[in-house]
């Protein structure tokens, strides 16, 4: 196998069977160099798997996109941290979708959600009459909350292609019915990284819409892709960057 070709975006042999790449997490292809981390085989295989998925969906891949983090050295947040972030996202999503301010405050009080919001989220929560644009922007946080509920094992189905909005009623009903969102352990690092790599490449494909090199985008909702990418990036990089600092533009 030509490892250099893989790193530069070439294809390896077709991946057979499942999607577990943990066995390759310690097969280092390129050693660390200063602040640049090592590249391991699981990162390469994960990228290849994602690119094959995108091509099957009729999307043109961008071979210039790098690999994402691998399992080696990965530090996921605790279930409690993910549960807190999920609850905050669901509440701002609900306010963005139009529930009354008094109902927002009741939910925060009942779930003890004080202090869970980022600075930008708190500003939105405190604004009694936010603009239509603000409401629309924060209403999409339902998608990020759904993604984290999947990571917390409350939803079994794979995330799949970011083509349609999540079932926000089911999301909120599930959250209200479960007092302890952190009652399960997080999904395995391999599974989270698989979805993170897919979300990254779907979102980058969505960002190419309207540019000279990409005129159409088959069956992808750009906003769903963005929120899913944001949530999974936070899961895999939470100890290096705050939620509000993640832009999802690259």
Regions found by a protein language model. Give the residues of each.
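Extended, charge-rich alpha-helical interface modules
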Residues: 2-250
């Amino acid at each position: 196998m030509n490892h250099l070709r893989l790193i530069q975006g070439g294809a390896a042999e077709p991946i057979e069977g499942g999607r577990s790449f943990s066995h390759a997490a310690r097969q280092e292809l390129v050693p660390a160099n200063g602040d640049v981390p090592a590249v391991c085989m699981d990162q390469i295989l994960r990228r290849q798997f994602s690119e094959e998925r995108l091509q099957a969906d009729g999307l043109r891949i961008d071979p210039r996109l790098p690999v994402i983090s691998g399992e080696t050295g990965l530090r996921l947040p605790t279930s409690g941290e993910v549960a807190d972030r999920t609850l905050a996202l669901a509440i701002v999503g609900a306010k963005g979708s139009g529930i009354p301010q008094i109902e927002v405050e009741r939910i925060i009080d009942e779930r003890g959600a004080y202090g869970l919001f980022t600075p930008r989220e708190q500003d939105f929560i405190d604004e009694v009459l936010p603009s239509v644009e603000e409401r629309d922007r924060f209403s999409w946080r339902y998608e990020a909350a759904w993604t984290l509920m999947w990571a917390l094992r409350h939803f079994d189905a794979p995330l799949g292609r970011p083509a349609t909005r999540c079932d926000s009623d089911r999301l909120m009903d599930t959250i209200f019915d479960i007092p302890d969102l952190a009652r399960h352990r997080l999904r395995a690092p391999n599974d989270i990284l698989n979805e993170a790599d897919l979300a990254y490449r779907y979102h980058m494909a969505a960002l190419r819409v309207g540019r000279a090199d990409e005129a159409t985008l088959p069956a992808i909702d750009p906003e769903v892709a963005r929120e899913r990418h944001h949530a999974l990036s936070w899961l895999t990089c939470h100890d290096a960057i705050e939620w509000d600092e993640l832009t999802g533009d690259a």
